Amino acid sequence: ATYKVKLVTPDGPVEFDCPDDVYILDQAEEEGHELPYSCRAGSCSSCAGKVSAGTVDQSDGNFLDDDQMADGFVLTCVAYPQSDVIIETHKEEELTG
C-alpha cells in the first residue's frame, strides 16, 4: 500500500506519497526534501518528529521509550507509514528537552 505523508516543517508543509515498505525519511529525500538525520538507524534523536495524525511502524528503532512513542514521537529514519500520516519534523529539541 502507499500512503499520503504530510510533513510539517519549519519551512512549511510538504506532502508526498510513501509506500508502506519505505522509511519516511528515505522517501522524503527521494522527493527532494531535506530533513535532519544522523545515524539513520533509529539509534539517536536527530530525525525525531511528532505524529499528529495517522500511525507509523517504527519497530526497527530502539532510541525512543514507550512513553515517548505514546506521546507521538517518531524517528523518521525507521518509520514506515501505516496510514495517511501527518508528522511535525525537527522535534529533537522537544524530545531531548
UniProtKB/Swiss-Prot annotation:
InterPro entries documented for this protein: 2Fe-2S_ferredoxin-like_sf (IPR036010), 2Fe-2S_ferredoxin-type (IPR001041), 2Fe2S_fd_BS (IPR006058), Beta-grasp_dom_sf (IPR012675), Fd_pln (IPR010241)
Keywords: 2Fe-2S, Chloroplast, Electron transport, Iron, Iron-sulfur, Metal-binding, Plastid, Transport
MF annotations from Gene Ontology: 2 iron, 2 sulfur cluster binding; electron transfer activity; ferrous iron binding
Binding-site residues, [2Fe-2S] cluster: 39, 44, 47, 77
UniProt cofactor(s): [2Fe-2S] cluster
Name of a matching Pfam family: Fer2
Protein's GO biological process: electron transport chain; ferredoxin metabolic process
Cofactor binding mode and count: Binds 1 [2Fe-2S] cluster.
NCBIfam families per the UniProt record, alphabetical: fdx_plant (TIGR02008)
Function according to Swiss-Prot or TrEMBL: Ferredoxins are iron-sulfur proteins that transfer electrons in a wide variety of metabolic reactions.
Family: Belongs to the 2Fe2S plant-type ferredoxin family.
Protein name in the entry: Ferredoxin
Organism for this UniProt entry: Scopolia japonica (Japanese belladonna)
